[in-house]
């Protein structure tokens, strides 16, 4: 998988070791919002727009915490480093102050969109194949952005609720041109929901 070889440390070292280039390293989180080519909200939003009664999450993935940042706020952090001489030679982590679990993330998207469904956590073996995470979610991905806040005065201009709202509006108007329809096997999901209702 591409993510197994995804590492920018060597590039960071190359830039920071060049004395003639006053480089600054910014380590960004998962960036969401307008122009998100990975369409991070899409799997959840499509189900909400399709008025699905539930978003089913693998239990380990539901608890996983991953840092995020709204694209507008991340752009401000980048601009701050460009114009502030103090940033030269520095390494800064940038992320929202609070890191949500995947479940909390889906619930926040749902709240902003007025979705009346619920998030249901299930073990991997009880989920349809299209919803099995296929990753080890034991390790959270959390960034501490204290340094850029203290040294450069960074703070989010766009609050999280407003950011999610703007991102959701963009995502709903800009579905990916191509996507795997197998991601949305509603028949299999309905079978799981029917089984749960009988339990």
Question: Which residue stretches match the model-derived regions?
Answer:
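Active-site Tyr-X1-5-Lys
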Residues: 1-25, 40
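Structural element of the ATP-grasp superfamily
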Residues: 11-15, 48, 148
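Flexible, glycine-rich beta-alpha linker
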Residues: 21-45
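Conserved loop-to-helix N-cap of the C-terminal "lid" that shapes the substrate pocket in Rossmann-like
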Residues: 25, 65-75, 91, 99-103, ...
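Glycine-rich Rossmann NAD(P)(H)-binding loop
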Residues: 33, 57-64, 92-99, 136, ...
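A conserved pocket-lining segment of Rossmann-fold NAD(P)-dependent short-chain dehydrogenase/reductase
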Residues: 47-69, 77
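Mid/C-terminal beta-alpha module of Rossmann-like enzyme folds, strongest
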Residues: 77-140, 145, 178-199
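A contiguous, mid-protein "functional segment" used to position or interact
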Residues: 149-180
């Amino acid at each position: 998988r591409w993510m197994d070889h995804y590492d920018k440390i060597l590039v960071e070292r190359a830039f920071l070791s060049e004395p003639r280039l006053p480089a600054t390293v910014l380590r960004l989180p998962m960036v969401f919002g307008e122009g998100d080519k990975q369409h991070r909200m899409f799997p959840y939003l499509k189900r909400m727009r399709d008025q699905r009664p539930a978003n089913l999450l693998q239990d380990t993935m539901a608890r996983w915490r991953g840092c995020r940042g709204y694209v507008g706020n991340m752009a401000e952090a980048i601009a701050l480093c460009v114009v502030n001489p103090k940033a030269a030679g520095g390494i800064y982590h940038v992320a929202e102050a609070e890191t949500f679990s995947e479940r909390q993330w889906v619930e926040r998207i749902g709240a902003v969109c007025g979705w009346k469904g619920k998030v249901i956590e299930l073990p991997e073996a009880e989920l349809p194949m299209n919803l099995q995470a296929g990753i080890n979610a034991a390790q959270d991905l959390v960034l501490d952005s204290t340094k850029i806040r203290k040294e450069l005065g960074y703070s989010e201009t766009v609050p999280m609720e407003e950011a999610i709202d703007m991102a959701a509006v963009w995502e709903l108007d800009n579905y990916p041109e191509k996507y795997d329809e197998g991601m949305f096997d509603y028949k299999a999901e309905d079978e799981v929901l029917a089984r749960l209702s009988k339990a």
